[in-house]
Amino acid sequence: KNCIINNKSLIEHDAVIGNHCHIATGAIINGEVSVGNETFIGSGAITKQCISIGNNCIVGAGVILKSDVRPNQVIKN
């Protein structure tokens, strides 16, 4: 609900995107990933399959996520 999903981003099978999220251009959300509410995924960021990203997180541009992210975290290169 009320999400922004930019061009050339990819959201794969069984991924769940929370409310009020922003998925930037070129981000790749792999299968079975859960993205919490009010989370920002930066341009070119990539998630490994089957991880969880908490509420109110910021994942910076180009970050490769390989494990779960707790709520209210900022992940950058």
Question: Which functions belong to the PLM regions below?
Answer:
Residues 7, 16-20, 24-77:
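Glycine-rich hexapeptide-repeat left-handed beta-helix
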Residues 1-11:
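Hydrophobic, well-structured mid-protein blocks that either form specific transmembrane helices
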